[in-house]
């Protein structure tokens, strides 16, 4: 691999203006004071300043800040996780109150060290947020929890408003990009979630720029629709550090627009696509759109 391949210069459309107003600063202080983590920070999301400073939203990351997996695209720390914090659900719920969120996303590191994959704490966090914030919609973004059906059922029984689980990349590249997760296991996870709670929208995300072809992407879209996934997000992969997978291609906004049209033509109720789109980007709009489409179909 050449240096030119490894360090491609970012195009103009990926350059963002940072906005660190008092909302951003205040949210950061609150997260630290409550010993909470956000995927916005841990995964180095390019939209953190827009979401925190302008939209005043955030994605909480529970079950600690250390992941048991080491996916080659992800900036989250890996290693031996800490013990579970059983007070975390209430702290998340209190923070949602303080932030005045209308929609909250709750994600987590993979906890392969736990028999339930963290499902019990995940479910309790959903219930705690619901108790304190009855008018806030709740989106969950779990790992595959080892592919154990009972773990998924525990989470779905908590009745989140939307279930998000990312396949991350296309089938052909999956083993190289996320070796300890399985493409078909993720599809099965999404299918089972819909079978357990048919009225809860399901969602997944694909990163672009890892070497996939247009045919690969269309196959992935078809796979998701075959498993009744409602919402799709498409965004540009950005290399977090030298040790992570390199960017093979930067997709221009026009190509994202084309892919969005293809996705919608395949029956997704909503598709968010763009260079800076991430799984939780404009998540409140996605869940509202999906619910409206579901209501229309009845």
UniProtKB/Swiss-Prot annotation:
<keyword id="KW-0408">Iron</keyword>
<dbReference type="InterPro" id="IPR003698">
    <property type="entry name" value="Lipoyl_synth"/>
</dbReference>
<dbReference type="InterPro" id="IPR013785">
    <property type="entry name" value="Aldolase_TIM"/>
</dbReference>
<dbReference type="GO" id="GO:0051539">
    <property type="term" value="F:4 iron, 4 sulfur cluster binding"/>
</dbReference>
<feature type="domain" description="Radical SAM core">
    <location>
        <begin position="53"/>
        <end position="269"/>
    </location>
</feature>
<dbReference type="GO" id="GO:0046872">
    <property type="term" value="F:metal ion binding"/>
</dbReference>
<feature type="binding site">
    <location>
        <position position="40"/>
    </location>
    <ligand>
        <name>[4Fe-4S] cluster 1</name>
    </ligand>
</feature>
<protein>
    <recommendedName>
        <fullName>Lipoyl synthase</fullName>
        <ecNumber>2.8.1.8</ecNumber>
    </recommendedName>
</protein>
<keyword id="KW-0479">Metal-binding</keyword>
<feature type="binding site">
    <location>
        <position position="45"/>
    </location>
    <ligand>
        <name>[4Fe-4S] cluster 1</name>
    </ligand>
</feature>
<feature type="binding site">
    <location>
        <position position="51"/>
    </location>
    <ligand>
        <name>[4Fe-4S] cluster 1</name>
    </ligand>
</feature>
<keyword id="KW-0963">Cytoplasm</keyword>
<dbReference type="GO" id="GO:0016992">
    <property type="term" value="F:lipoate synthase activity"/>
</dbReference>
<keyword id="KW-0004">4Fe-4S</keyword>
<dbReference type="InterPro" id="IPR031691">
    <property type="entry name" value="LIAS_N"/>
</dbReference>
<dbReference type="Pfam" id="PF16881">
    <property type="entry name" value="LIAS_N"/>
</dbReference>
<feature type="binding site">
    <location>
        <position position="67"/>
    </location>
    <ligand>
        <name>[4Fe-4S] cluster 2</name>
    </ligand>
</feature>
<dbReference type="Pfam" id="PF04055">
    <property type="entry name" value="Radical_SAM"/>
</dbReference>
<keyword id="KW-0411">Iron-sulfur</keyword>
<feature type="binding site">
    <location>
        <position position="74"/>
    </location>
    <ligand>
        <name>[4Fe-4S] cluster 2</name>
    </ligand>
</feature>
<feature type="binding site">
    <location>
        <position position="280"/>
    </location>
    <ligand>
        <name>[4Fe-4S] cluster 1</name>
    </ligand>
</feature>
<feature type="binding site">
    <location>
        <position position="71"/>
    </location>
    <ligand>
        <name>[4Fe-4S] cluster 2</name>
    </ligand>
</feature>
<dbReference type="GO" id="GO:0005737">
    <property type="term" value="C:cytoplasm"/>
</dbReference>
<keyword id="KW-0808">Transferase</keyword>
<comment type="similarity">
    <text>Belongs to the radical SAM superfamily. Lipoyl synthase family.</text>
</comment>
<dbReference type="InterPro" id="IPR007197">
    <property type="entry name" value="rSAM"/>
</dbReference>
<dbReference type="InterPro" id="IPR006638">
    <property type="entry name" value="Elp3/MiaA/NifB-like_rSAM"/>
</dbReference>
<keyword id="KW-0949">S-adenosyl-L-methionine</keyword>
<comment type="pathway">
    <text>Protein modification; protein lipoylation via endogenous pathway; protein N(6)-(lipoyl)lysine from octanoyl-[acyl-carrier-protein].</text>
</comment>
């Amino acid at each position: 691999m050449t240096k030119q391949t490894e360090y491609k210069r970012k195009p103009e459309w990926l350059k963002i203006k940072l906005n660190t107003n008092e909302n951003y600063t205040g949210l950061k202080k609150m997260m630290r004071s409550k010993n909470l983590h956000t995927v916005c920070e841990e995964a180095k999301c390019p939209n953190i300043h827009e979401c925190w400073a302008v939209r005043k939203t955030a994605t909480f990351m529970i079950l600690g800040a250390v992941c048991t997996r080491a996916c080659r695209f992800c900036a989250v720390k890996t290693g031996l996780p800490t013990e579970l914090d059983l007070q975390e659900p209430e702290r998340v719920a209190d923070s949602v109150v303080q932030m005045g969120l209308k929609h909250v996303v709750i994600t987590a590191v993979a906890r392969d060290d736990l028999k339930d994959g963290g499902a019990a704490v995940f479910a309790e966090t959903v219930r705690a947020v619901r108790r304190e914030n009855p008018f806030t919609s709740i989106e969950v973004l779990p790992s595959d929890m080892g592919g154990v059906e009972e773990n998924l059922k525990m989470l779905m029984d908590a009745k989140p408003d939307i279930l998000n689980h990312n396949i991350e990349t296309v089938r052909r590249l999956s083993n190289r990009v996320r070796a300890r997760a399985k493409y078909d296991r993720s599809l099965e996870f999404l299918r089972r979630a819909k079978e357990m709670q048919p009225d809860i929208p399901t969602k997944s995300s694909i990163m672009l720029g890892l070497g996939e072809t247009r045919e690969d992407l269309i196959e992935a879209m078809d796979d998701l629709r075959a498993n009744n996934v409602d919402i799709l997000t498409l965004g540009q992969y950005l290399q977090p550090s030298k040790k992570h997978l390199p960017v093979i291609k930067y997709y221009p906004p026009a190509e994202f627009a084309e892919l969005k049209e293809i996705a919608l033509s395949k029956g997704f109720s909503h598709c968010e696509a763009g260079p800076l789109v991430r799984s939780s980007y404009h998540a409140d709009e996605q869940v509202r759109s999906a619910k409206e489409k579901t209501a229309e179909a009845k």
